């Protein structure tokens, strides 16, 4: 199984795994890992391995927990991102709900992508759509800003559906949402 994992372009780690499994994957896996903390309760399991992750997608509360600071402003988001990157983490995409995404990487590149205009029918599934778009765009080799932009669009499109998974999810429909601005 490790050969299969190591052959991946990217491993998406959903934080419902036991802590020992997360540590094993981070210690033994060679493929880059994008982790989604899932919740503040489960986010703590990622603290010991932050420096081994290629990317992290916390929401505001998860980023506050992992950076040990409150995020009330854009400057706070930037400072929290720096604290997380100081652990050795490669890239962080802090999802700030209606305020969009603040992204930063170890090279010093940053991006603030405002939320795409949408009519929210159901926010459940929005974060998962953001994580999926981040993974897909990272694998494509998009820039930090473009990756965050597509993720914002995917989250907005997901939230427009009354169901958890929007059956209209596609790159074309995400682009339509992004062009509404």
Predicted regions and their residues:
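Conserved N-terminal subdomain of the carbohydrate kinase-like
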Residues: 1-10, 27, 172-181
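A short alpha-helix capping/helix-coil boundary motif
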Residues: 2-5, 58-61, 133-134, 142
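Conserved beta-alpha-beta core of the PfkB/ribokinase-like small-molecule kinase fold
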Residues: 8-79, 99-101
């Amino acid at each position: 199984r490790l050969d299969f994992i190591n052959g991946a372009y990217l491993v998406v780690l959903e934080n419902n795994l036991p802590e020992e499994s997360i540590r094993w994957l981070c210690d033994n896996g060679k493929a880059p890992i994008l982790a989604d903390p899932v919740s503040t309760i489960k986010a703590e399991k990622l603290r010991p391995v932050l420096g081994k992750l290629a990317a992290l997608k916390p929401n505001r509360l998860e980023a506050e927990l992992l950076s040990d600071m409150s995020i009330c402003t854009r400057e706070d988001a930037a400072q929290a991102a720096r604290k997380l990157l100081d652990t050795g983490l490669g890239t962080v995409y802090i999802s700030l709900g209606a305020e969009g995404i603040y992204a930063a990487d170890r090279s010093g590149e940053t991006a603030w992508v405002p939320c795409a205009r949408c009519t929210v029918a159901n926010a459940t599934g929005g974060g998962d759509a953001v994580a999926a778009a981040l993974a897909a765009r990272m694998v494509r080799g998009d820039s930090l800003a473009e990756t965050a932009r597509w993720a914002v669009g995917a989250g907005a499109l997901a939230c427009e559906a009354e169901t958890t998974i929007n059956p209209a999810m596609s790159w074309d429909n995400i682009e339509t949402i992004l062009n509404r601005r």
